């Protein structure tokens, strides 16, 4: 048979079809992958208790993992323990060898840590330590120190207002009762305030020491009730974070009351605005980028088999502890120079006039 160019082309086409068919057959015989494998996961708790997790932690962690050449996911539980557990399961199923965990609740943290360790993964507690767990490392701020800063900031504000010497009535809006950090903050501020209550220099408001679950809506309801129980005569508030401080401010305004010494935490844009406007005395500024970078570096070192450098221990856990700062009108620009916040985040609308 004569082998013409036309016949050659037909033969090549036929061979190509057979090759594609065989390739497809082999490919379909292979087990499907459940998803791309990853080396690490960062699990954040929610968006309700603070805006920091979406504004700062998530992007900083993603950038740090990328810079370290680590494949990782950063996930938020959106205030659900069951969702956070499912996220952890998904990460482990994809091969994650390190879980960087900021637990929504201590119970969730214990369950996630136990599961991760049983599957050969290391757990780094991020911002919140899970007590009595098999965590490998802890990266956070000195949280007892945070509480002390808040208490001393409240006292300084009372003195500046001239009410410290008149046995002012103080209310405390604590964070989450199931959150170990909430207890550490309280340990810190109670170490300063309790002796003053005992000596009579300060007076704790009636029903004036309550837990809020870090929920500003719940905090508002509780503070409304505190005002009612104390005939609107509360002269200072230790609010555990900026969200709760905002709830206090909303309540004061609703009752046509003037600003009183009031603390916060997290240096949120709204918190800084309230400081500039005179409604909030100060906030604890925790530079999140160094914290995120430090935590990501621990994960990177573990994955690459390098030694992890720590600077302390908390409850026996090797830890990296960073130093918080008390932020007021006097030093609020620090958040701009550190690029923690943009001036355009704070100095806008009715608050623009307060920025110098």
List where the protein language model places each region:
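A residue-level marker of the well-folded mature domains of exported/periplasmic proteins
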Residues: 2-6, 10, 27-356
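Bacterial N-terminal signal peptides
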Residues: 12-21
């Amino acid at each position: 048979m004569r082998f013409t160019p036309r016949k050659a082309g037909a033969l090549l086409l036929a061979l190509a079809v057979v090759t594609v068919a065989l390739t497809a057959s082999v490919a379909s015989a292979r087990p499907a992958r459940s998803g791309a494998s990853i080396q690490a996961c960062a699990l954040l708790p929610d968006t309700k208790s603070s805006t920091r997790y979406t504004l700062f932690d998530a992007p900083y962690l993603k950038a740090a993992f990328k810079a370290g050449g680590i494949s990782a996911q950063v996930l938020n539980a959106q205030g659900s323990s069951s969702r956070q557990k499912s996220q952890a399961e998904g990460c482990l199923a994809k091969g994650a060898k390190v879980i960087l965990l900021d637990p929504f609740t201590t119970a969730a943290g214990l369950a996630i840590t136990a599961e991760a360790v049983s599957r050969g993964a290391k757990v780094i507690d991020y911002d919140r330590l899970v007590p009595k767990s098999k965590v490998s490392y802890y990266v956070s701020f000195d949280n007892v120190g945070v509480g002390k800063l808040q208490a001393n900031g409240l006292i300084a504000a009372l003195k500046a207002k001239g009410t410290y010497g008149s046995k002012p009535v103080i209310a405390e809006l604590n964070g989450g009762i199931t959150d170990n950090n909430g207890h550490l903050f309280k340990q810190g501020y109670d170490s300063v305030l309790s002796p003053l209550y005992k000596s009579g220099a300060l007076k704790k408001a009636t029903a004036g020491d309550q837990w809020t679950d870090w929920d500003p809506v719940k905090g508002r309801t509780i503070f409304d009730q505190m005002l009612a129980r104390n005939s609107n005569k509360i002269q200072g508030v230790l609010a555990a974070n900026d969200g709760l401080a905002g709830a206090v401010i909303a309540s004061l305004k609703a009752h046509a009351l003037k600003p009183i010494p009031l603390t916060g935490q997290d240096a949120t844009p709204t918190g800084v605005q309230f400081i500039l406007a005179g409604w909030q005395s100060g906030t604890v500024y925790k530079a999140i980028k160094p914290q995120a970078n430090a935590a990501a570096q621990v994960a990177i070192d573990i994955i690459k088999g390098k030694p992890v450098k720590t600077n302390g221990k908390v409850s026996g856990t090797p830890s990296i502890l960073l130093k918080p700062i008390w932020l007021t009108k006097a030093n609020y620009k620090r958040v701009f120079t550190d690029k923690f916040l943009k001036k355009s985040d704070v100095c806008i609308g009715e608050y623009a006039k307060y920025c110098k």
